[in-house]
């Protein structure tokens, strides 16, 4: 678990799959992602199982959670992909699937936590993000 001021990043769980399906089938959420919709529960389960088979040093997807009252609410996912340990690079990815949490700074906090994790704990030299020029939130 990676703790921030108002958020935490945790390993994804099988119980998260229904949220993934809902998010990945929402065109507003996926408009800047390279994802083909519609996605089924079975497709997300297969993706999840593939993530479990991947060694953590090759990249990992983490759930973004915010604390509301006395519970943590899963609002999105972030991760490092295509980790190259020889060249010490990785691609960064993030999605805030719960639209009620857009434009509140949670994505920026999650980004900072993942970058810190990548540089300080994985000893990476370069972390990059491919961004559509029409995605202003990703460029902040």
Where are the language model's segments positioned?
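GNAT-family acyltransferases
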Residues: 1-100
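Conserved hydrophobic/aromatic "anchor" residues
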Residues: 12, 117-119
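Conserved G/P- and acidic residue-centered "switch" motifs that form tight phosphate/ATP-binding loops
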Residues: 72, 105, 135
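Conserved acetyl-CoA pyrophosphate-binding loop and the N-cap/start of the following alpha-helix
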Residues: 101, 105-114
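Conserved active-site alpha-helix within GNAT-family acetyltransferase domains
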Residues: 108, 133-140
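Core alpha-helical elements of the protein kinase catalytic domain
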Residues: 112, 116, 139-140
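Conserved GNAT acetyl-CoA-binding A-motif
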Residues: 120-130
């Amino acid at each position: 678990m990676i703790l921030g001021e108002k958020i935490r990043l945790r390993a994804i769980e099988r119980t998260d799959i229904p949220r993934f399906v809902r998010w990945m089938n929402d065109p507003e959420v996926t408009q800047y992602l390279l994802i083909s919709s519609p996605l089924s529960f079975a497709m997300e389960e297969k993706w999840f199982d593939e993530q479990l088979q991947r060694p953590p040093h090759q990249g990992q997807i983490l759930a973004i959670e915010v604390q509301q009252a006395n519970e943590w609410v899963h609002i999105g996912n972030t991760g490092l992909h295509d980790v190259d340990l020889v060249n010490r690079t990785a691609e960064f990815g993030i999605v805030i699937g719960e639209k009620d949490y857009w434009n509140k700074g949670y994505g920026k906090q999650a980004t900072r936590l993942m970058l810190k994790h990548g540089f300080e704990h994985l000893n990476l030299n370069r972390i990059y993000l491919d961004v559509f020029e029409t995605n202003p939130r990703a460029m902040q």
